[in-house]
A protein has these predicted regions:
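Juxtamembrane helix-capping/reentrant segments at transmembrane boundaries
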Residues: 27-42, 85-106, 170-177
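Low-acidity, Ser/Thr- and Arg-rich intrinsically disordered low-complexity segments
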Residues: 278, 284, 292, 296-300, ...
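Short, intrinsically disordered C-terminal tails of secreted or membrane-associated proteins
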Residues: 328-336
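Hydrophobic transmembrane alpha-helices
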Residues: 4-17, 40-73, 103, 115-157, ...
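A basic- and aromatic-enriched beta-loop-alpha substructure that forms the phosphate/nucleotide-
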Residues: 58-96
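Active-site pocket-lining segments that scaffold enzyme catalytic pockets across diverse folds
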Residues: 107-114
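C-terminal ends of transmembrane helices
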Residues: 18-28, 75-81
Length: 338
């Protein structure tokens, strides 16, 4: 397998990260490194799909799968960076770099090496000479769909939860977050495993390179999760502590004690937020504090004095008197002259 495409991707990622380092010197946001990392993954997948020496089918799948996965992550991180302030990890990086400019440069360059290592499984999968859709190909596509949809779904659920002001200081227990405290890490691991399945058929020495991305994902998750949970305990206290006691840390699973435990049962179901139309109706129906409610003219009653009943029309029931026939008369009733 020719290593030249990997070297080209490394050079491209390094150039992108150097430009990003220059931009963040003015923007003062270290989250730009993660944004550019996702862009490098997407660009690397498209490049490998063009230049790899494998069959057409695996090259197309790598370009589509890797390109879409990187683009989704790029858009998610871009939206979060524009709307939300930098998280605690990036703030710590920025504070450390204020006294050491070269340290932030080294951080951005390390992200270029990280993106290149994560792209190696894409290149290996694109080098597969198998030109037919096998059972491994179908399994790889299925695992990829599960991983990517799980990543996207968990990110969307968490973003919607954070958008509601009433959820400040609370822990998201909605959707996938009911079953795992870190579903985004779990489904990212599943996503990267799909390229190992797509590369089945290559020699073991080459195929083993596809395990780089899942292994790195697991290492990153194990390193970041303790810091993330320590920050959550500091900001959310007992709410997050009870969440830890009932919810799996990584692999999605039923809350512990459900359905016998009341806390686990409450974590199992969280009412969905009201729709925008329902919220607008509730806002119009709920009076503001101190507002005076004026009844409509049709329902207005006199304030002083007794309530005078309104006259009512009484409809008399028409009673028909039956005709009394004389036994000896043959003249119809109504024609008798008086």
């Amino acid at each position: 397998m020719n290593p030249q495409p990997v070297v080209v991707v490394l050079g491209f990622c390094t150039a992108v990260m150097l430009c990003g380092w220059l931009v963040q010197q003015r923007r003062r946001n270290a989250a730009l490194a993660d944004l550019l990392w996702a862009a490098c993954i997407s660009a690397g997948a498209l490049y490998y799909g063009l230049v790899a020496n494998g069959a057409l089918l695996p090259r197309l799948l790598v370009a589509m799968m890797g390109g879409l996965g990187g683009f989704r992550l790029f858009m998610h991180l871009l939206q979060r960076m524009l709307v939300e302030p930098a998280d605690s990890r990036h703030r710590a990086l920025r504070e450390r770099a204020q006294s050491n400019l070269a340290w932030m440069l080294a951080f951005f360059v390390s992200r270029a090496f990280s993106a290149t290592l994560f792209s190696v499984p894409l290149y290996v999968a694109a080098s597969n000479p198998e030109d037919q859709a096998t059972a491994w190909t179908m399994l790889a596509a299925g695992v990829y769909l599960v991983g990517l949809s799980g990543e996207a779904y968990s990110d969307i659920q968490l973003a919607q939860f954070r958008d509601q002001p009433r959820n400040r200081g609370r822990t998201c227990r909605r959707g996938l977050w009911r079953y795992s405290r870190h579903p985004n890490y779990f489904f990212a691991f599943v996503h990267w495993c799909s390229y190992a399945l797509l590369a089945v058929g290559l020699p073991w020495s080459v195929w083993s390179l596809t395990l780089l991305a899942p292994a790195l994902t697991a290492v990153i998750a194990l390193r970041r999760i303790p810091a993330v949970e320590a920050e959550a305990l500091r900001t959310r206290g007992e709410d997050y502590r009870s969440y830890q006691e009932t919810t799996s840390i990584l692999v999605p699973w039923l809350p512990s004690g459900w359905p016998n435990d009341a806390a686990a049962a409450a974590a199992w179901y969280t009412p969905p937020p009201p729709s925008r139309a329902r919220a607008a109706v509730n806002a119009r129906a709920t009076p503001l504090p101190g507002a005076r409610i004026t009844p409509s003219p049709s329902s207005r009653l006199p304030v002083d004095g007794p309530i005078t009943p309104q006259p009512q029309r009484v409809l008399a029931k028409r009673v028909e008197t039956p005709a009394i026939a004389e036994p000896s008369s043959t003249v119809p009733v109504g024609e008798v002259d008086g």
